[in-house]
Amino acid sequence: MEAIKADITQGLEKGSLITCADNTGARELKITSVMGYQGRKNRHPKAGLGDTITVSVTKGTPEMRRQVLEAVVVRQRKPIRRPDGTRVKFEDNAAVIIDDLGEPRGTEIKGPISREVAERYGTIASTATMIV
């Protein structure tokens, strides 16, 4: 896995509701944990762009609801700072559901994804229609 060059402020914490940006049948996801987060006692785990998270499906098809899955954050409302000084933020918080190998489970990604996620996850970038 490649390091992200931008200064990413974690804009999502445990318990946040985010939209699902793929066509797996899930519409809304709830963050239950953040992979690799090493925080302090009583501090809520936080996630940002490109982080792998564990989510629970709260809205979607009956087959997808109440499943616990892994996902990657592809959009966040909190601005991030790129090395050239520009700041990028999106209209919503969104994630893409992935399998054990880190490849997207869906065949289509709705909406744009960030360039930082595209550099880290090549298979998600090849599925995406727009990279910002």
UniProtKB/Swiss-Prot annotation:
InterPro entries: Ribosomal_uL14 (IPR000218), Ribosomal_uL14_arc (IPR019971), Ribosomal_uL14_CS (IPR019972), Ribosomal_uL14_sf (IPR036853). It comes from the Archaea. GO terms for cellular component: cytosolic large ribosomal subunit. Keywords: Ribonucleoprotein, Ribosomal protein, RNA-binding, rRNA-binding. The keyword RNA-binding applies. One of its GO terms (biological process) is translation. Transmembrane segments: none annotated. One of its GO terms (molecular function) is structural constituent of ribosome. HAMAP family: Ribosomal_uL14 (MF_01367). NCBIfam families: PRK08571.1, uL14_arch. Belongs to the universal ribosomal protein uL14 family. PANTHER family: 50S/60S RIBOSOMAL PROTEIN L14/L23 (PTHR11761), LARGE RIBOSOMAL SUBUNIT PROTEIN UL14 (PTHR11761:SF8). Part of the 50S ribosomal subunit. Forms a cluster with proteins L3 and L24e, part of which may contact the 16S rRNA in 2 intersubunit bridges. Binds to 23S rRNA. Forms part of two intersubunit bridges in the 70S ribosome. This is Large ribosomal subunit protein uL14. It comes from Halobacterium salinarum (strain ATCC 700922 / JCM 11081 / NRC-1). The gene is rpl14.
